[in-house]
Amino acid sequence: MNFSHLYDIYYNRINKKLFEIIQELPFQDSVLFRAMKYSTLSGGKRLRACLIYATGETFQVNIAALDVISAAVELVHSYSLIHDDLPCIDNDYFRRGKISCHIKYGENFALLAGDALQGLAFNILSNSNMPGVHDSIRLKMIAEFSNAIGYSGMCIGQMLDLEKERKKINISELEKINLYKTAFLIRCSIRLAYFASNNFSKEVLFILDKFSVSIGLAFQIQDDILDLKNDIKKLESKRNKTKNTYPLLIGLKKSKIKIKELYKEAFFTLEILKKNFNVNILKLLTQFIMKRFK
């Protein structure tokens, strides 16, 4: 079985859901609406949504509930990218093959668009129908979501990234940045899908956390490598000018070895889950993501 077909199904499903959510918003003639729509529907890999759907399949979660979780997570991811690109953070002119939101609509409206998308994500997670999900579980999901994207998660990761910019750091410090900045939202995505199954087990959650952190860290290193496009001259010329990344810190060869180690850890956790659950789709998804850097 090939995951590509299933990826297309997940990808199209979440894009349709996001389009429906955006199209239901008021003030559609406003710059704010256009900025939100532009950033949310301008492509992207939808990795987090795919992980949510695949995890949901593993634990037999109603797909309508997975739609809600996926939409909330992807809206927050879009918000984070808008803010990451701002001049005060990464000052990036391009995102997903297009000009960044603040370049197209201005810094003021980009800032507001990010804020509005975050609020919309919580609105969706709080109020949308999620069949089979009790209110107590919904509250647990909201608490997990807010923790993953706030002070104890994504925001502290971004702070650490900015704080260490242009400074020499070690691998341990870099992994901490990637853990908070990237892996924790991926962990949250998988946790929310698992919570929606209403079958909570600390042991299973621990295994899923190991899986998601391995995937999240590997994915971040892959992105760092893809950004450099294996251009050694670019690597050398930017060594003292760019943010800290694995390829800049330890080189491309060791970075690829690290990716393989992380995916090996991810597959190991799936083998443990395999004893009680059907993890075939999660395994196929992991293999699919792995191919991005080969």
From Swiss-Prot:
Q: Catalytic activity, per the record?
A: isopentenyl diphosphate + (2E)-geranyl diphosphate = (2E,6E)-farnesyl diphosphate + diphosphate
Q: Which GO terms describe its molecular function?
A: (2E,6E)-farnesyl diphosphate synthase activity; metal ion binding
Coiled-coil parts of chain: none
Q: In which residues is Mg(2+) 2 bound?
A: D84, D90
State where isopentenyl diphosphate binds.
Answer: K45, R48, H77, R96
| Subcellular localization | Cytoplasm
- UniProt keyword annotations, A-Z: Cytoplasm, Isoprene biosynthesis, Magnesium, Metal-binding, Transferase
What is the protein named?
Farnesyl diphosphate synthase
State where Mg(2+) 1 binds.
D84, D90
The protein's Enzyme Commission number? 2.5.1.10
Listed binding positions for (2E)-geranyl diphosphate are R95, K181, T182, Q220
Q: Name the gene behind this protein.
A: ispA
Q: What's the chief localization of this chain?
A: cytoplasm
GO terms for CC? cytoplasm
